[in-house]
């Protein structure tokens, strides 16, 4: 009997025939049992007829599209956009008009069923990937907090399924290079292990005009050790330990109107991530029970020339040490027409963060003292005793939570009805220390020679603690109908709630410290009075949770004996308190802030097509349309109702056409052309800065002999220019331009002993 566990939950809401973008299917690209993978725990292994919108990217596509990081997935799925800018800390993801540049992500991610709680670690070096699932729409019922935009599930190749050695090496202009090596071995029928490593390097593509050095160079690497043990016929254990390291210098940001990157202070990002996860499964005839226990530790340091000018304005450092543990217990079973899944999830995360801001002489003058020194009505001139000022902020952030969730599914012939429920509790606390120790002198502007009339030391040592907690009920409802067609097809409708937790704007503490310092200065000046109202720290740095309701209808249609597969989805999203990143007004503000818009809405459509008339030809395409606008949003000065939500593209497009033919009895040549596109997107709430729609073509030729593949490729061969990012700092506008034309060679070696 066939049992279907519906995405009643926001978990695998995939559209039908799990869209796959591979141009050529080979026997060893993925490993199936009866046509169905057996690695997923929270969702039905066969996602092809589930009542949700999703894209599955299989191993062959991962390699042919050179997916070695999260950013390369962008546009492969409709309305799924990951801009390529900044460093690996960025990991901004936008789905259906929902996204996040700072703090909590709007899209969750798991690797081999283990959740990543910090989006700082999302963009890691990928290697030996079996498949990637991109689920669109709220997945909060199964996957919990911060998945209101969707969920990414990544599954790696396992040593029980594949034995042998794999080598991947790629080199391109820049120069850039990437390599991975893996060994998979089964010691006996019950025990298998794999060891893999990878590294990458790039010298970047653009020079910093200030020092004539390339900006944006990077290097990194990773190790992974997986052990699989079949303890008994019904009990198995899987443990994976992984380490990733990345180091990047510079940021390729340039002043709007300029043709050059031109800043003077050091910029870099360094990150170490270690994780270990143990999964234990117990399978019986009536139910299965799984336990997933994980630990993750992140150490990183981001240092920026925050003004990105050849001036000594100010630099910012954000360095964290974070440890997190998670525990998920999942039970699922079936009785007749009834299928069910239930679980308990808990997590705890402890973060220590240093976030000092250092003002240089230009920053002191233009952001602080010029306010007084250039005011003719004030007879005094200020001068700090040191050429720099350190504003030091230290934080200890503790976050924990627990959730219970359940989904039920009833199968009435062709009709399927599902209900998912989740109760999620989270608590968070922030201990902060904001300190500054400096001194200044005041001089009469008319005094000759200048003689100080006042010398004042400023010592600030503010300490405090903030805390909050959130309790959220997250339901989802689905109904689907299996069409009477030979190729599996279905119609579905779903209603689900999305939820993203609230938090604190840590970067705004430097703004608060500046205000405190200016208050101290004003109170010391004769005839001047500082504001007597205290600064409400909680009011300034806190932001509320974001909530949404997603209404969706879709269809999964298979035609021509499965040679044509089409997925269609229409959706409407009602959002309350949408979290958006803004830049405080003025030419003296230095930070970014996450704030809540009152109300917004998003609606759109998605289309995926795969057509394979013969094994020679393969055509795939995906298109997404999003119309996301504010319904109510005032920032105190302006009313943005009716404006587009920033950073989310209105259109995404991907298309590929591949042709394969054999040469002799052993070689196969594949010619592939593809196109990615996105836009229009607005860069701010005022909608006065934007990037029009752009399209980037790529091409590749692959020679495949089974155990060896050689590919020649070129990305962006038209040299299309466009902006990948925009931001404002101290009244200036900056942007990052896209990478230029890239080309290179990739070698793949497969020594598959399990096929012998």
Segments and roles (model prediction):
Residues 71, 75-114:
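Extracytoplasmic beta-strand/coil segments of soluble accessory domains associated
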Residues 112-138:
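Short acidic/polar hinge/loop motifs at secondary-structure boundaries
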Residues 70-73, 92-97, 110, 134, ...:
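N-terminal periplasmic accessory domains that precede
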Residues 341, 351, 499, 675-684, ...:
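C-terminal beta-signal and adjacent terminal beta-strands/loops
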């Amino acid at each position: 009997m066939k049992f279907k566990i519906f995405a009643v939950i926001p978990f695998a809401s995939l559209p039908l025939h799990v869209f796959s973008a591979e141009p050529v299917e080979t026997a060893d690209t993925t490993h199936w049992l009866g046509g169905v993978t057996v690695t997923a725990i929270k969702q039905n292994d066969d996602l092809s007829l589930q009542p949700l919108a999703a894209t599955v990217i299989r191993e062959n596509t991962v390699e042919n599209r050179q997916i070695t990081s999260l950013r390369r997935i962008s546009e492969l799925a409709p309305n799924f956009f990951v801009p390529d800018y900044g460093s690996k800390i960025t990991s901004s993801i936008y789905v259906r008009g929902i996204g996040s540049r700072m703090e909590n992500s709007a899209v969750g991610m798991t690797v081999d069923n283990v959740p990543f709680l910090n989006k700082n670690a999302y963009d890691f070096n990928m290697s030996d990937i079996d498949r990637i699932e991109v689920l669109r729409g709220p997945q909060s019922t199964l996957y919990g907090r911060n998945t209101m935009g969707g969920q990414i599930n990544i599954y790696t190749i396992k040593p029980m399924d594949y034995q042998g050695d794999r080598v991947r090496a790629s080199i391109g202009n820049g120069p850039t290079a990437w390599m991975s090596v893996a060994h998979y071995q089964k010691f006996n029928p019950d025990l298998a292990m794999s060891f893999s490593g990878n590294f990458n390097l790039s010298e970047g593509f653009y020079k910093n005009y200030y020092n004539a050095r390339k900006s944006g160079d990077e290097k990194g690497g990773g190790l992974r050790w997986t052990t699989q043990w079949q303890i008994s016929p019904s009990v198995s254990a899987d443990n994976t330990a992984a380490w990733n390291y990345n180091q990047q210098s510079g940021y390729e940001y340039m002043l709007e109107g300029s043709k050059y990157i031109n800043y003077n202070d050091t910029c870099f990002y360094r990150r170490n991530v270690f994780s270990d996860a143990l999964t234990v499964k117990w399978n019986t005839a009536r139910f299965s029970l799984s336990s997933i226990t994980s630990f993750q530790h992140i150490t990183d340091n981001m240092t920026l020339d925050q003004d990105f000018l050849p001036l000594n304005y100010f630099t910012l450092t954000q360095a964290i040490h974070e440890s997190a543990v998670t525990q998920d217990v999942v039970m699922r079973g079936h009785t007749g027409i009834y299928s069910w899944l239930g679980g308990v999830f808990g997590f705890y995360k402890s973060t220590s963060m240093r976030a000092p801001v250092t003002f240089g002489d230009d920053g002191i003058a233009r952001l602080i003292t010029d306010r007084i020194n250039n005011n003719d009505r004030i007879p005094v001139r200020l001068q700090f005793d040191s050429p720099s000022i350190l504003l030091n902020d230290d934080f200890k952030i503790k976050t924990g939570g627990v959730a219970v969730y359940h989904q039920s599914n009833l199968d009435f012939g062709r009709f399927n009805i599902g209900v998912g429920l989740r109760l999620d509790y989270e608590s968070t606390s922030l201990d902060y220390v904001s300190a500054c120790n400096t001194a200044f002198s005041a001089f009469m502007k008319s005094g000759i020679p200048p003689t100080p009339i006042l010398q004042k030391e400023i010592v600030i040592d503010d300490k405090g603690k903030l805390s909050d907690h959130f309790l959220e009920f997250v339901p989802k409802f689905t109904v689907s109908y299996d069409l009477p067609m030979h190729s599996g097809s279905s119609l579905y409708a779903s209603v689900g709630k999305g939820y993203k937790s609230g938090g604190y704007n840590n970067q705004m503490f430097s703004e608060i410290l500046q205000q405190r310092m200016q208050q101290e200065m004003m109170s010391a000046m004769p005839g001047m009075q500082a504001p007597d109202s205290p600064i409400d720290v909680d009011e300034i740095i806190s932001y509320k949770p974001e909530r949404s309701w997603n209404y969706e209808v879709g269809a999964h249609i298979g035609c021509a004996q499965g040679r044509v597969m089409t997925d269609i989805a229409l959706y409407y999203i009602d959002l309350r308190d949408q979290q958006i990143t803004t830049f405080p007004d003025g030419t003296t503000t230095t930070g970014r802030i996450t704030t809540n818009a009152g109300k917004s809405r998003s609606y759109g459509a998605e289309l995926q097509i795969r057509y394979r008339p013969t094994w020679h030809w393969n055509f795939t395409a995906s298109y997404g349309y999003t119309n996301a606008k504010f319904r109510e949003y005032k920032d105190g000065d302006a009313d943005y109702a009716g404006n587009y939500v920033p950073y989310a593209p209105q259109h995404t497009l991907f298309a590929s056409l591949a042709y394969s033919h054999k040469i002799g009895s052993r070689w196969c040549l594949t010619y592939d052309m593809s196109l990615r596109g996105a836009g229009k997107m607005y860069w701010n709430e005022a909608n006065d800065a934007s990037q029009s729609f752009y399209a980037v073509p790529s091409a590749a030729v692959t020679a495949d002999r089974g155990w060896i593949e050689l590919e020649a490729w070129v990305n962006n061969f038209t040299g299309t220019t466009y902006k990948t990012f925009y931001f404002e700092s101290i009244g200036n506008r900056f942007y990052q331009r896209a990478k230029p034309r890239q080309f290179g060679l990739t070698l793949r070696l497969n020594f598959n002993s399990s096929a012998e």
